Regions:
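Outer-membrane beta-barrel "beta-signal"
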Residues: 146, 153, 167-178
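Residues that define the transmembrane beta-barrel architecture of outer-membrane proteins
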Residues: 25, 42-46, 87-91, 134-140, ...
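Repeated loop/turn-to-beta-strand initiation elements of outer-membrane beta-barrel proteins
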Residues: 27-29, 57-62, 103-107, 146-156
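Residue-level signature of outer-membrane beta-barrel architecture
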Residues: 52, 97-99, 146, 160, ...
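Cleavable N-terminal export/targeting peptides
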Residues: 1-26
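Membrane-embedded beta-strands of outer-membrane beta-barrel proteins
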Residues: 48-50, 93-95, 142, 154, ...
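Outer-membrane beta-barrel translocator domains and adjoining extracellular loop/strand segments
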Residues: 39-45, 70-81, 118-129, 164-172
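Short glycine/proline- and aromatic-enriched beta-strand/turn motifs that initiate or cap beta-hairpins
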Residues: 19-70, 91, 97, 115
């Protein structure tokens, strides 16, 4: 529900600003890949984001990422016949910062709030036990981007999510500016 509300709010703001011809607010959408890990697990995500660039330096963004790999936990019990299946997603909102550099490059950063949802199924001899857990915390990104055209950019960033004792990794994405 929160995701739907955030995306709806972003769409309403973007539609309003699209009609205000003299505004400098620029909406964008993006899609990308994120790899996050901590001491217990490695997770690969595909995700979507959308945002508003308020001026050359400051913006706001909403994001959603869903795990796409077979997540294996340290100490998995496969050798005992227990099969685990996990699904992770994280979503949230953040403030973004950009600083133009030379030759279409720019430095970028984001700080915000992220919620992480974890669903795990464990199956043993035909019996399945399911559990869900969620946590929230800060998300911080620091990286760089390159503008191929005024509308198309690529970004790479170090990412830290503090939920569930912290995850660190890398994010790569393509963005389209309207």
């Amino acid at each position: 529900m929160k995701k739907l509300l955030l995306v709806s709010l972003l769409g309403a703001i973007a539609a309003t600003t699209a009609n205000a011809g003299s505004t400098t607010i620029q909406p964008y959408v993006g899609a990308g890949y994120t790899f996050l890990n901590n001491d217990d697990v490695d997770v690969h995500f595909l995700g979507l984001n959308g945002g508003l660039q308020f001026n050359e330096y400051v913006g706001a963004e909403v994001f959603w990422n869903k795990s796409v790999n077979d997540i294996e936990f340290d100490g998995d019990l496969d050798e005992f016949g227990v099969r685990t299946d996990a699904d992770v997603q994280y979503y949230g909102i953040g403030l973004t910062a950009k600083y133009p550099l030379a030759n279409n490059f720019y430095a970028k950063g984001m700080a915000g709030y992220a919620r992480v949802d974890l669903d795990v199924d464990a199956t043993f001899q035909g019996y399945t036990v399911s559990t869900s857990e969620d946590d929230s915390g800060l998300i911080v990104q620091a990286g760089a981007g390159y503008n191929f055209t005024p509308n198309l950019a690529a970004e790479v960033a170090y990412t830290h999510v503090s939920a569930f004792d912290g995850f660190n990794g890398i994010n790569a994405q393509l963005k389209y500016n309207f």
